[in-house]
Structure formats: structure tokens, C-alpha cells
A protein has these predicted regions:
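Alpha-helical cap/lid subdomain in secreted, periplasmic
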Residues: 52-55, 59-62, 78-210
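Bacterial N-terminal signal peptides that target proteins for export
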Residues: 1-12
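Serine-esterase "nucleophile elbow" of acetyl-processing enzymes
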Residues: 23-72, 82-90
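Bacterial N-terminal signal peptides
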Residues: 10-20
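Acidic-and-aromatic substrate-binding clefts and catalytic sites of carbohydrate-active enzymes
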Residues: 73-77
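N-terminal twin-arginine translocation
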Residues: 3-5, 19-23
Length: 210
């Protein structure tokens, strides 16, 4: 997921720089902060799960704009560096979907947890509600590492009292019908499944007071 990082960053910059404040548009803002799985590597912008979530919100009668702040190759450390930038959009809700690249690079679960906790704290301090999406690594990374890695997400969610989707790629991972040839990045159909699986976790956060 490290390829096309510059293109992903440029896309996210355009998404945020073109943002019109919610007060001016009469709508709330949701930001999806993630890596290439969020950016929609290999699919059209309107096929990535953030765009699909916005379509679902409209169908359900909600007036939210969903900003795709996915950057290909990003890690939790990179996400932490981008928090202030994300907050320029005055988000009501932030979906934090980071950690996949930390795992693929074998980075420390303890460092990943510290980064995620810092991200969540800063978002909460700004008044945003957070939905944390968990990640997994392949079993060939070893039982000890995979166990420690996967334990990070519920631990962060519990300590920060935020909503948790246990696995962003639930129903998508390892299904060749829903993934591109690399076996990592979802197809348009896979992104639709992600949006559908995210919805039950996002729905309770909509319209809550800050």
C-alpha cells in the first residue's frame, strides 16, 4: 500500500482545500482518515467507500459531506501528523482507518497504539466523534505479532470510549471477487461492502451533540 503515495496525498489535499465550511453549506462533515484502503487505490473516487457512505447518508436523509482523507502508504505516524490538517474541515465525525501499513511493515504494536491514542485524543479535544476501524495482518507474521497487533484497536477504543468497527475489511479480505489482483486493495464492489459494513457503526454517531 506504499505505491502512489504522492498521488494519494495530492488527492487528499484537493479534497480538503476545496472544502466549504459546514456552516456555509448547512451540512455536517465526516472525514475518513486512512491509507490506500480509504483513498480508493485502483478505483474511481466515487467508488471508494467514503463516497459510497456519503451516497448512503443522502439516501437515508442525512446532510453530511464525507471527505476522503486517505493517503496511499500512510501509517498511524503519518496520520498523527495530519490531524491538524484534518481538523481544518471542522469534522463532526472522523473515521480513523489506519494501521494496515504499520502491520505490513512489521512496526511495533506499542508504537501504533500510542499513535492511535494520540490521534483520537486530539480529535476528541476538538469536539469530533471518532469511529475507529480495526485492521489485521496475515498469519505469516507470526502468532505473537498478529495477536499483539489486533489487540491494539479494541484497547484504544476502550480506553478512549470511542466506537469500534473490529475489522475494516470484514467480508472483503481474502475474497478474490472483491479484491484487485494484488489481493490487498478492494474493487469497487469491495468498497461497497466496506461502506455497508461500516454503516451500523456510523449510524449511532450521526446527529449527536458535541
Amino acid at each position: 500500500m506504499s505505491g502512489f503515495r504522492a498521488r494519494g496525498l495530492a488527492f487528499a489535499c484537493v479534497a480538503l482545500l476545496s472544502f466549504v465550511p459546514a456552516t456555509a453549506r448547512g451540512e455536517g462533515v465526516i472525514v475518513a482518515l486512512g491509507d490506500s484502503l480509504t483513498a480508493g487505490w485502483g478505483v474511481a473516487p466515487d467508488e471508494a467507500y467514503p463516497a459510497r457512505l456519503e451516497m448512503r447518508l443522502r439516501r437515508e436523509g442525512y446532510t453530511y459531506r464525507v471527505i476522503n482523507a486517505g493517503v496511499s502508504g500512510d501509517t498511524t505516524a503519518g496520520g498523527l501528523r495530519r490531524v491538524d490538517w484534518v481538523l481544518h474541515a471542522s469534522p463532526e465525525i472522523v473515521i480513523v482507518a489506519l494501521g494496515a501499513n504499520d502491520g505490513l511493515r512489521g512496526q511495533s504494536p506499542q508504537a501504533m497504539r500510542a499513535n492511535l491514542e494520540a490521534i483520537v485524543r486530539r480529535l476528541q479535544a476538538a469536539g469530533a466523534r471518532v469511529l475507529l476501524a480495526g485492521m489485521r495482518v496475515p498469519p505469516n507474521y507470526g502468532a505473537e505479532y498478529t495477536t499483539e497487533f489486533q489487540a491494539v484497536f479494541p484497547a484504544v477504543a476502550w480506553s478512549a470510549k470511542v466506537a469500534l468497527m473490529p475489522f475494516l475489511l470484514d467480508g472483503v479480505a481474502a475474497d478474490p471477487r472483491l479484491n484487485q489482483p494484488d489481493g490487498i486493495h478492494p474493487t469497487a464492489a469491495g468498497h461497497q461492502v466496506i461502506a455497508d459494513r461500516l454503516w451500523p457503526y456510523l449510524r449511532p454517531l450521526l446527529g449527536q451533540g458535541k
